[in-house]
Every structure is written in structure tokens, then in C-alpha cells.
Amino acid sequence: MPRVKGGTVTRQRRKKIMKLAKGYRGAKHMQFKAASTQLFVSYKYAFRDRRRRKSDFRKLWIARINAAARQNDISYSKLMHGLKLAGVDMNRKMLADIAYNDSKTFAQLADTAKKALN
């Protein structure tokens, strides 16, 4: 039986890997083995960080709300509890956007939370 070398299939597979590895430094964009190893790691990081992005944004929103709340003489936890008692149903993303862009409206929300706590 004659030896089968793979031919076009192997070349296409390697070409695809090398195309995906464009922009990597050193051997990782030139050598197939290094490129395929790095791609595996890159996809692993991408998978992990797609999930991590959600918690990163939540942390950012909480930090922004807390900073704006403390300017209005109330802590983050008391603000959130007060808004819940007052029946204000806003998620952290919306609150952070209001705190960042519209401080007067946020001050009104903080006053609403303070009144609900008393």
C-alpha cells in the first residue's frame, strides 16, 4: 500500500491555525506547534473571561453606586436596603448609570432611600 501524506487536508488545517495565530509574538505566529498550543490557551482564557466579565461589571457598578451614595451621606448597603423598602425596583446597572451621569436624580433616590429607612 502506498504511503498517504495527508496532502491538502493537513495543509488546510495548518493554514487555518496559522491564520488564527496572526498577531502573536515570537514563534507563536510562525511555528505550527507553538501556534496551536497558544491558540488552545487563548481560547481557554476567552472562555474564562467571558464569564468573569459579568462579575467585573457588577463590581464596577457597585463601586460607582457606593461612591455616589457616600457623597449623599449614606452607605451602599443602606441605600440598596432603603430603595428596596421604598419599592424602587432598579438594577445596579441602571443605578450606576444614573450615579455617573445624573447626580441630581441620584440624590433624589438617596433621599427616598433615607426616608424609607426611618
UniProtKB/Swiss-Prot annotation:
Q: Which InterPro entries match?
A: Ribosomal_bL20 (IPR005813), RIBOSOMAL_L20_CS (IPR049946), Ribosomal_protein_bL20_C (IPR035566)
Query: What is the stated purpose of this protein?
Result: Binds directly to 23S ribosomal RNA and is necessary for the in vitro assembly process of the 50S ribosomal subunit. It is not involved in the protein synthesizing functions of that subunit.
Which PANTHER family does this entry report, sorted A to Z?
Answer: 39S RIBOSOMAL PROTEIN L20 (PTHR10986)
Q: Which GO terms describe its biological process?
A: ribosomal large subunit assembly; translation
Q: In the record, what terms sit under GO molecular function?
A: rRNA binding; structural constituent of ribosome
Gene3D superfamilies reported in the protein's UniProt record: 6.10.160.10, Ribosomal protein L20 (1.10.1900.20)
Family to which the UniProt record says this protein belongs: Belongs to the bacterial ribosomal protein bL20 family.
The name this protein carries in UniProt is Large ribosomal subunit protein bL20
Keywords from the named record: Ribonucleoprotein, Ribosomal protein, RNA-binding, rRNA-binding
The scientific name of the source species is Lactobacillus acidophilus (strain ATCC 700396 / NCK56 / N2 / NCFM)
Q: Where are the transmembrane segments?
A: none
Q: What is the lineage of its organism?
A: Bacteria, Bacillati, Bacillota, Bacilli, Lactobacillales
HAMAP family from the UniProt entry: Ribosomal_bL20
Cellular compartments per GO CC: ribonucleoprotein complex; ribosome
